[in-house]
């Protein structure tokens, strides 16, 4: 099928689709290996209807090409939407040269690789990162696509690939059940997804708001970060890391650093960050008035978040994104063939698990031979 693509001039160092679309932020972009292009469904601008958006990058001529399949208005509307989605108002070169390198020598060894934080739908971000709990990118990708294909609405089919909308909270509560989600492989996350969807439906009704995204954006109005995080953690299955991912990638709080096992490792290994008793006491006092935070927050990890913000400044979340990608390697996510390629870190851990299993087997066989020798 032939489409007329719009064009946007952008240097690969400022935006590299391969380093952004399937690297642990968004989980529904599909890579077409034959056509060298990405596709997904998204709402364009203020529209409530989903359109299929196709992107490809002409790296040699530094051009981003784009087209929408469906009723999204015009090409200018899509271009404006993509500039907001990719946060192209923020210059990575400026952040490297004027913010990060002067304050962190580690960035002097790096250069902009087009890794930036996306401006995503907060509702989809919330559910996606509930799926991320104790999970890897490949499985999160499968889960997010499963939610759409089973409980979203079919938008269209292109070259045999079916494209669906991301289900709203109402659609999840009316179409999904915990049992069905468990059957689809969501495990204990099934309960969290259903209960979060139900709570959001009730929260919207109380606030007289119909849109999931509009409601989640409304909790930021005149609110401090700690209060927004407290509210997000009131949803079942949402801890500090998931809440911080929603704040950073869904609510555009650029200074927030979600601290997971990878970021914690970077902080301790490369920056020697650790919390002493006084640090923990101060944080404990700080959260006295926030009962959910007091219960859910790991104070040592929260100290890491604060120290990294102090080091990297108002775009600390972006700096974390750069080092996170460097740490784990890329991923190729969903493809039009139906396969989901794995990132470097997943392959390393799987190899380690195989080696450990082989070593354990050798030990068991060795023990068995010793026992047999004793019997003889």
Swiss-Prot record:
Q: Where in the cell is it found?
A: Nucleus
User: Might you report a single GO cellular component term?
Assistant: mitochondrion
- Tell me one GO biological process term: DNA repair
Q: Any keyword DNA damage?
A: yes
Enzyme Commission identifier(s): 3.2.2.-, 4.2.99.18
**InterPro entries of this UniProt entry?**
DNA_glycosylase (IPR011257), HhH-GPD_domain (IPR003265), HhH_base_excis_C (IPR023170), Ogg1 (IPR004577), OGG_N (IPR012904), Oxidative_DNA_repair_enzyme (IPR052054)
The UniProt entry's sequence similarity note says: Belongs to the type-1 OGG1 family.
Could you identify this protein by its name? Answer: N-glycosylase/DNA lyase
What is the organism field in this record? Answer: Saccharomyces cerevisiae (strain ATCC 204508 / S288c) (Baker's yeast)
């Amino acid at each position: 099928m032939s489409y007329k693509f719009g064009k946007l001039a952008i240097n690969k160092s400022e935006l590299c689709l391969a380093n952004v679309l399937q690297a642990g932020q968004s989980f529904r972009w599909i890579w077409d290996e034959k056509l060298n292009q990405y596709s997904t469904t998204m709402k364009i601008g203020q529209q409530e209807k989903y359109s299929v958006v196709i992107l490809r990058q002409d790296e040699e001529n530094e051009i981003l090409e784009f087209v929408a399949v469906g009723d999204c208005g015009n090409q200018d509307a899509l271009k404006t939407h993509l500039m907001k989605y990719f946060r192209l108002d923020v210059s990575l070169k400026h952040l490297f040269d004027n913010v990060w390198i002067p304050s962190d020598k580690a960035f002097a060894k790096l250069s902009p690789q087009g890794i930036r934080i996306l401006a995503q739908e907060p509702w989809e971000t919330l559910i996606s990162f509930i799926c991320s709990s104790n999970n890897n990118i490949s499985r999160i990708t499968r889960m997010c696509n499963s939610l759409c294909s089973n409980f979203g609405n079919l938008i269209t089919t292109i070259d045999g690939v079916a494209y669906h909308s991301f289900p709203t909270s109402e659609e999840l509560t009316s179409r999904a059940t915990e049992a069905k989600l468990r059957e689809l492989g969501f495990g204990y996350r099934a309960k969290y997804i259903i209960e979060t969807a139900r709570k959001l439906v009730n929260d919207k009704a109380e606030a007289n708001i119909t849109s999931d995204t509009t409601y989640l954006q409304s909790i930021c109005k005149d609110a401090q970060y700690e209060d927004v995080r407290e509210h997000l953690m009131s949803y079942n299955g949402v801890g500090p890391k998931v809440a911080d991912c929603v704040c950073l990638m869904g609510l555009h709080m650029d200074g927030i650093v979600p601290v997971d096992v990878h970021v914690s490792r970077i902080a301790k290994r490369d920056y020697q960050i650790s919390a002493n008793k006084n640090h923990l006491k101060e944080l404990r006092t700080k959260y006295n008035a926030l009962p959910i935070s007091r219960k859910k927050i790991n104070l040592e990890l929260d100290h890491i978040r604060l120290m990294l913000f102090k080091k990297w400044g108002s775009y600390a979340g972006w700096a974390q994104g750069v080092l996170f990608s460097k740490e784990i390697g890329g991923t190729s996510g969903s493809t039009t063939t139906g396969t989901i390629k794995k990132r470097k870190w997943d392959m390393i851990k799987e190899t380690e698990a195989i080696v450990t299993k082989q070593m354990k087997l050798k030990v068991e066989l060795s023990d068995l031979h010793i026992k047999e020798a004793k019997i003889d």
